[in-house]
A protein has these predicted regions:
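Extended, leucine-rich alpha-helical cores of fungal transcription factors
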Residues: 1-31, 35-81, 99-153, 157, ...
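Short beta-strand elements
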Residues: 163-167
Length: 247
């Protein structure tokens, strides 16, 4: 599907129907209570596999919606968004393992941090959906501030070794550049861009209203800086990028 959003949209729509039929959108895997617990039953392994498929489709669906402007297939109100057991701890352990080894880790590494996918879903619903397009300037800026706060909380939760910086320049290269760290940073900058780019819809931008105009200008400046950082980082990380990973 690399580079073909139409195909991605088509196949995700089909896959989502199977996910709904199997109920993978409404159940979450239970954590193992003890390290000496019995091996997983076939039903438990099946549920875990289906849940991973749900998260994979969910992740792709959010990117497709933001890139095409078409409505999302997965509505958060109809999904259990409980993260897989131990997801956050295993994410960075797997990233560190993969950074120093070419072997595949035991736990799946999704294309995007699942918490960012949930944030993308909220950003689309709050800023770009049909309902969101009817919001007043005040409501729109309120949503932008709340999403920006949540994105910053996510950034600060990332271990310092992998934490994206607010902006990027060649004077401060990423010491842990790898495929997964690249995707982490790219998706952080993408979220920053799509959140603050929405401020360009404010009427104050066209009418030049004083106080509101200052807030809109600072928001747009963040969007531009994030886009700039994306281009600079891609240039720096070109040597680790694989063919077909970007659409």
């Amino acid at each position: 599907m690399s580079g073909n959003l139409r195909s991605a949209n088509y196949f995700v729509s089909i896959a989502s129907r199977f996910i709904f039929m199997l109920g993978a959108n409404t159940f979450s895997c239970q954590p193992t209570t003890s390290p000496t617990a019995e091996p997983e039953s076939l039903d438990a392994r099946t549920q875990r596999h289906l849940r991973n498929l749900f998260w994979l489709c969910y992740t792709i669906d959010k990117d497709v919606a933001l890139r095409t402007g078409q409505p999302m297939v997965f509505n958060d109100e109809n999904c259990d968004l409980t993260l897989p057991p131990g997801y956050v701890d295993q994410l960075y352990t797997s990233m560190a393992y993969h950074h120093h080894s070419r072997e595949l880790p035991d736990n799946p590494i999704f294309p995007v941090d699942l918490r960012l996918s949930v944030l993308k879903s909220r950003a689309y619903s709050s800023l770009y959906s049909f309902k969101a397009l009817q919001k007043t300037d005040a409501d729109l800026l309120k949503e932008i501030r709340e999403l920006d706060d949540d994105l910053e909380q996510w950034r600060l939760s990332v271990p310092l070794e992998w934490r994206p910086t607010l902006s990027f320049s060649h004077e401060m290269p990423d010491p842990n550049v790898s495929m997964h760290s690249v995707m982490l940073r790219m998706n952080y900058h993408l979220c920053m861009t799509i959140i603050h780019q929405a401020s360009s819809r404010c009427n104050a931008w066209a009418k030049g209203h004083g106080g509101v105009m200052e807030g809109v200008s600072s928001s747009l400046a963040l969007s531009v800086e994030s886009s700039r950082s994306t281009l600079l980082y891609l240039e720096m990380a070109e040597h680790v990028l694989m063919d077909g990973i970007f659409w």
